[in-house]
């Protein structure tokens, strides 16, 4: 019985070692992909400093002139583990075959001004890169996961497009875009 316990214990240790080795190999593969594609792991100091100057929350004055959609059941369409929630939708049935579809994206341009250091870095990166174990964001996390993320229960500035859809005609009859808060 003691020998059986010893063998079982050794097998358990070997399984743990194999799991650790597999994880390390995956980590090395991901780092290799990052290196091969010259993907930046960090932001330059001036970009981090610029991101710190962006407010963490919206002021009441920033809502003026925007259509208020905060009372609508708008839902994000990102994955469960996503932290950079930048797009959301709302659907309302208007009639038997008619719907209003609202598509909402974070109004990043309100905070990231053209040709500013944040804009130049975002253009250089082009997109956020989603890897198995991490995200290499286009903007610092203070923005991408913060003020520019459509987090539940938090007021955010958005750009919205509403489409009036007729299911019978399989077309939309009205398209309207506007600055909003959601």
Regions found by a protein language model. Give the residues of each.
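Short acidic-glycine loop/turn motifs at beta-strand connectors
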Residues: 93-95, 165-170
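Charge-lined substrate channels and their catalytic hotspots, especially those that engage the 3′ end
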Residues: 1-102, 109-154
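Single conserved hydrophobic/aromatic residue that forms the stacking wall/gate
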Residues: 174-182
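Low-complexity basic/metal-binding stretches
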Residues: 8, 171-172
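Phosphate/diphosphate-binding loops
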Residues: 158-159, 163
């Amino acid at each position: 019985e003691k020998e059986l316990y010893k063998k079982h214990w050794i097998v358990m240790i070997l399984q743990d070692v194999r799991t650790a080795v597999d994880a390390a190999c995956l980590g090395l593969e991901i780092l290799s992909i990052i290196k091969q594609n010259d993907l930046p792991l960090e932001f330059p100091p001036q970009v981090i400093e610029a991101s710190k100057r962006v407010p963490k929350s919206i002021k009441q004055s920033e809502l003026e002139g925007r259509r208020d959609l905060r009372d609508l059941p708008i839902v994000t369409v990102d994955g469960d583990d996503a932290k950079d929630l930048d797009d959301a939708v709302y659907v309302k049935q208007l009639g038997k075959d008619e719907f209003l579809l609202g598509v909402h994206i974070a109004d990043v341009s309100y905070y990231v001004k053209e040709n500013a250091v944040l804009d130049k870095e975002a253009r250089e990166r082009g997109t956020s890169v989603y890897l198995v174990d991490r995200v290499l964001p286009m903007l610092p996390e203070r923005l991408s996961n913060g003020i520019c993320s459509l987090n539940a229960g938090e007021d955010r500035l958005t750009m919205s497009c509403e489409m009036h859809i007729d299911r019978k005609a399989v077309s939309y009859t009205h398209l309207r875009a506007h600055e909003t808060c959601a």
